[in-house]
Design a protein with these regions (language model features):
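Structured core elements
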Residues: 2, 12, 298-300, 446-448, ...
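Generic recognition of stable, solvent-exposed alpha-helical segments in well-folded globular domains
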Residues: 13, 17, 42, 62, ...
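Structural motif
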Residues: 13, 58, 516-523
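Conserved catalytic cores of very large enzyme subunits
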Residues: 89-518, 539-542, 546-550
Length: 550
């Protein structure tokens, strides 16, 4: 005879466990109210007989109900009460927070799993430990209460991977493209303080780093900004510097040529750009967010974003050049040695203006290549290929959109509305064109293709059957992510939803309209390897290669 355990598995009925449980309850009541050994064995025999008479395997809860009733039938009400209490306590132990040991090991720096989990975090630092402690609580809630059992089981068995469960308890999204242009041009609010349009490039850079830190503290994934959104402030600084220079020269009663004045202005401007870029570089590697780490930030460098505005494009080129030069140099560590900083990541776009010798900005591409050879950044995007592949509604091949990834990997899908979804985010820089800045990713789930392949035993029909079953699990898990964000109020992260980073919704307004219609994305990843193997019917010596792309 078998019974069904709480985890769903079947085991052989063991009468000794019933005897032991009743005996424990019996031993804590006064002697006058105790059951005899014969009575305890009779209760166990009765339960065994009832279970044996059933035409199906009974589960543990049903059996415990039988035990309670049998004790009550003997008139041993105090023993029954103690048994019920024992049962309740055991239930609490099963459902109680199971994170105590993990949290204690975190605090004492004995948790090897956490030490190896994230190279961007130092688990010995108090601020990081606080984030990890909160993460352990979130993981526990997620696995015990928030996710369906089949998803938890699949995750624990490695069939799928439910990413970032340490943040799932809160209503947080993954990664995004920050609408820095809207925030700088039209103002924002940081920690209850109104931040108006900056009046210089260096101030714009400083505000940008504050925005980045605030955004990073309200999501768990990476973010990307564009240097194009900082470029308009170069000319603002240029004009301000020119006014200052002219005033200084007037006070000195000096009248140099216009050419000399322009030379002085451009020299001071270059110094300001250098300081501004340095602010971004050093702030990003020294800022500490509530996640216990520096912001995961990508900087996008695309001359084509300046359009036909040659002044803006020229100023953008100066910023890009300075960004590449400083990244090539690196930053000093505590020993004073120049090293490669982890952030910001850099993305450089190859385009007609910079891709070959003789083009106006080829010098930037050579500098980028030199930087990559030494610092492994920037990464590169082909404008030509993106315009072929990333087609928003109404666009044709070769005339698509060019934009960066969100953080390090995930790309938004093209704008299926073709017009920025009629500005449902209420952005103040809406222009009716395809929209990317201000959009985001809801979360990620990964399917383990290697496990699918191994489980199939080399049978391709079985492979696809298992693959479809696992995809159904992934869909269930992804819908959990989507549904977790539904109903989230803009008040949960004002910098994101109210003050321009992603939207300018009203206070108390749900973000739901941004979760549908392709405005935001949700990601299915895959873990797999490329296998080289000879199939059963391949002639000896022949090489057969199977590739699977999702």
């Amino acid at each position: 005879m078998k019974i069904i355990k709480r985890n769903g598995s079947e085991v052989v009925f063991d009468i000794s466990k019933i005897i032991a449980a009743v005996t424990k309850a019996n031993n804590v009541v006064p002697a006058a109210q105790q059951l005899s050994k014969q009575q305890i064995h009779a209760i166990a025999d009765h339960v065994q007989a009832v279970c044996g008479a059933r035409n199906h395997a009974m589960n543990v809860e049903e059996i415990q109900d039988l035990v309670e009733n049998a004790i009550m039938d003997t008139g041993a009400h105090e023993v029954a009460r103690k048994y019920i209490t024992y049962r309740y306590v055991q239930g609490l132990k099963r459902t109680h927070n199971t994170t105590d040991d993990r949290i204690l090991s975190l605090i004492e720096c004995n948790n090897e799993e956490v030490k190896q989990e994230n190279s961007n975090k130092n688990p010995t630092v108090n601020s990081v430990q606080r984030d990890y402690m909160a993460g352990e609580v979130s993981k526990d809630l997620t696995m015990r209460m928030l996710l369906p059992p089949e998803v938890v089981k699949a995750h624990e068995e490695g069939i799928i991977h439910f990413h970032d469960s340490d943040y799932f308890a809160q209503h947080m999204h993954n990664c995004d493209l920050v609408n820095l242009d809207d925030m700088l041009q039209n103002g924002t609010v940081i920690s209850g303080t109104l931040i108006e349009k900056p009046h210089s490039f260096s101030t714009a850079c400083n505000i940008a780093t504050q925005i980045i830190a605030q955004v990073a503290s309200n999501q768990y994934g990476g973010q990307s900004i564009s240097l194009t959104h900082l470029a308009p402030f170069v000319d603002i600084s240029r004009k301000k510097i020119r006014r200052d220079v002219e005033a200084e020269l007037k006070n000195l009663d000096v009248r140099p040529s216009e050419e000399k004045v322009s030379e002085i202005v451009e020299g001071r401007l270059r110094e300001e750009i250098k300081r501004g870029v340095q602010t971004i570089q050093y702030q990003e590697v020294t800022l500490m967010t509530t996640n216990g780490q520096a912001p995961f930030i990508t900087v996008f460098m695309y001359l084509g974003e300046a359009g036909d505005n040659q002044r803006l494009k020229s100023d953008l080129a100066i910023i890009i050049e300075e960004m590449l030069r400083q990244r090539y140099q690196g930053v000093k560590n505590e020993a004073g040695v120049w090293i490669t900083p982890a952030f910001p990541k850099l993305i450089y776009v190859l385009e007609e203006d910079n891709v070959r010798e003789g083009t106006p900005y080829f010098y930037l591409t050579k500098l980028a290549a030199k930087c990559t050879a030494k610092r492994m950044v920037p990464d590169y995007i082909s404008e030509k290929k993106m315009r072929e592949y990333k087609l928003s509604k109404g666009e044709t091949e070769g005339h698509g959109d060019v934009y960066t990834c969100m953080g390090c990997r995930s790309f938004l899908t093209p704008d299926r509305s073709g017009n920025g979804w009629d500005n449902i985010a209420n952005a103040k820089n809406y222009d009716g064109k395809p929209k990317y800045y201000g959009r985001f990713n809801q979360g990620v789930v990964t399917i383990n293709l290697v496990d699918v392949a191994l489980s199939s035993g080399g049978d391709f029909d079985r492979f696809w059957k298992i693959f479809d079953e696992r995809l159904d699990l992934c869909h269930t898990a992804l819908m959990c992510r989507h549904n977790r964000l539904k109903g989230t109020l803009s008040d949960a992260a004002p910098i994101l939803w109210q003050y321009g980073a992603l939207a300018r919704l009203q206070k108390g307004e749900p973000i739901d309209k941004l979760l549908y219609g392709g405005y935001s994305t949700i990601s299915l990843g895959y873990a797999g390897i490329e296998l080289h193997h000879p199939p059963l019917q391949t002639p000896p010596g022949a090489v057969h290669r199977q590739r699977l792309y999702l």
